[in-house]
Structures are given as C-alpha cells and as structure tokens.
Design a protein with these regions (language model features):
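Conserved catalytic or regulatory cores that recognize and/or transform ribose-phosphate-containing ligands
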Residues: 1-130
C-alpha cells in the first residue's frame, strides 16, 4: 500500500518545544501505519526556550523556511492545520494561514482544527477548508 503524507501546519514562532510539538506528536502517534505526519520543525533548532529566527541560513533564513514549507505543502496528500484562537496571547499563526493559502492554490484537501468561532465562520475558510 502506498504511503500518504499529512503536513502538520500550526504555530511555531515564539512557541516552546512543548507548544509546538506536543500536538504534532499526538497526531503522528495516532495515524494509520501507512500515513506519515510531516512536521515543519524537523530542521528548525530551538533558540533558548522558543523557536524563532536563527543565524544558520541553511535552515533559518526566511527563504530556507519558506522553501521547505512550500515543498512539504506541495508534496503532501493533505494539510492538517491547527489554528488555536490564542496561544500565549499570540494569534493567529501567520505562517499557517499562508500554508492554508498554498494548499488551496494547490487544490490539497485541508482539515482545520480550531477553537476560533470567527475563523470557522469566515467565508473564505468555509468555502475552501474541509
């Protein structure tokens, strides 16, 4: 059976390791054996206690991050986008919103997980997200 890939889009910037990874680990650990969860964090080092810009241009430049995330979005079978209403007084995850836009343009199916009522009622989300 062919493997399927799910891109796990969600908050990263200024998140602790736990905030950025716990939900992704939970999803990956509960997927069928033929479904692989792809995390955008696999190449991004921590800076102190949080994820954020770094000095290694191979991994941390805006271009490198955008290229990796675009590649993952383009090559996955489905996007699972986690957009909590608020995470440590930060909202929304702008990178995730951009990845949702990429997925719409690529005609990828999108599953949105959120507690944000405004987001679930937004006409562009309602028209384009499963």
């Amino acid at each position: 059976m062919n493997k399927k890939y799910i891109y796990l889009a969600g908050p990263i910037a200024q998140c602790s390791y736990k905030e950025a990874n716990d939900w992704r680990d939970y999803v990956r650990n509960n997927l069928h054996e033929n479904i692989i969860g792809i995390s955008p964090l696999r190449c991004e080092p921590m800076h102190g206690e949080t994820y954020g810009p770094g000095n290694d241009s191979r991994y941390n430049s805006p271009g490198a991050i955008a290229a990796k995330n675009w590649y993952d979005t383009e090559h996955c079978n489905l996007i699972l986008a986690y957009l909590p209403r608020e995470l440590n007084e930060r909202r929304p995850s702008y990178g995730t919103v951009i990845e949702i836009g990429w997925a719409i343009g690529l005609r990828k199916p999108i599953i949105l997980v959120t507690d944000d009522e405004y987001l679930t009622e937004h006409p562009l989300i309602k028209a384009n997200v499963n």
